[in-house]
C-alpha cells in the first residue's frame, strides 16, 4: 500500500490534518513530516513498538540514537537530566531553529531511543507543523531524517515518497523545505562542548552563544 500524501500549509497548518496525523501516531505508526530543514520521520518516542518501526522503515542500525523534536523547554527538562547552564544559553540563542543539542537523558524514554547511551539529542524546530502536531499528540516526536539509511536526505514530499512511499502510511506535504541543510549538532558535557556536525547554524554562531565555555574535540 502506498503512503497517503496530504497537503499542509507550513505557516498555518490545518488542525484537521494534524488531528488526522496524530491519530496515526497514536496507533503507533511512523509518518513523514516537514521541518524547518528537511523532512523527518515522526513517531511517538514513548511507544517502543513505534520506535522499533522507525528502525525497520529506515533500515537504521540500532546503535544510532533517534533525535527528539520538542516544542517547549518544559519537554527538555523532562527528557534530559542535570541540564547545564550552557544548554539554556544555546536554547535562548538558537531555538526554535536548526540546532540539535545532545545532553544526558532522563529515564522517561525507552533506552532504544538513546541507543543505550543515556544521551539524548533534542531539537526545537522552527516549524508550526511540528509544534502544533506535538501539541495535538501531547508528547514530543522522533525527528530522524525521512530517508532510507545511507540514502540522500529528503527536502520535499516527492523525495520522501520515492524512498519511503511503500513503507509508511502518511506523508504531510508542505512542498520544498526552506533549508535543505541538516541541523547543526552540539554535544554538551557539563560546561564543555563540542561540535558534532556543522549544519544550518555556523560554528561561529555557536561559539558566540557559548561565550568562554571550553570547546573539546569531537
Language-model features and meaning:
Residues 1-218:
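Active-site-adjacent structural elements in enzyme catalytic cores
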Amino acid at each position: 500500500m502506498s503512503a497517503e500524501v496530504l497537503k499542509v500549509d507550513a505557516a498555518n497548518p490545518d488542525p484537521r490534518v494534524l488531528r488526522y496525523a496524530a491519530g496515526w501516531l497514536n496507533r503507533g505508526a511512523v509518518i513523514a513530516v516537514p521541518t524547518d530543514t528537511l523532512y523527518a520521520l515522526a513517531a511517538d518516542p514513548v511507544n517502543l513498538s513505534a520506535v522499533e518501526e522507525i528502525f525497520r522503515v529506515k533500515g537504521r542500525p540500532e546503535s544510532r540514537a533517534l533525535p527528539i523534536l520538542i516544542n517547549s523547554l518544559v519537554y527538555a527538562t523532562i527528557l534530559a537530566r542535570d541540564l547545564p547552564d550552557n544548554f539554556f544559553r544555546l536554547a535562548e540563542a538558537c531555538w526554535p531553529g536548526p540546532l540539535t543539542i545532545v545532553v544526558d537523558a532522563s529515564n522517561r524514554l525507552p533506552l532504544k531511543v538513546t541507543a543505550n547511551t543515556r544521551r539524548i539529542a533534542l531539537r526545537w524546530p522552527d516549524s508550526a507543523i511540528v509544534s502544533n502536531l506535538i501539541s495535538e499528540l501531547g508528547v514530543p516526536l522522533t525527528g530522524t531524517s525521512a530517508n532510507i539509511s545511507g540514502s540522500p536526505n529528503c527536502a520535499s514530499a516527492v523525495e520522501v515518497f520515492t524512498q519511503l512511499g511503500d513503507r509508511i502510511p502518511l506523508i504531510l506535504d508542505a512542498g520544498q523545505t526552506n533549508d535543505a541543510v541538516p541541523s547543526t549538532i552540539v554535544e554538551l558535557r557539563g560546561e564543555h562542548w563540542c561540535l558534532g556536525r556543522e549544519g544550518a547554524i555556523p560554528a561561529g554562531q555557536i561559539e558566540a552563544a557559548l561565550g568562554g565555555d571550553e570547546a573539546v574535540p569531537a
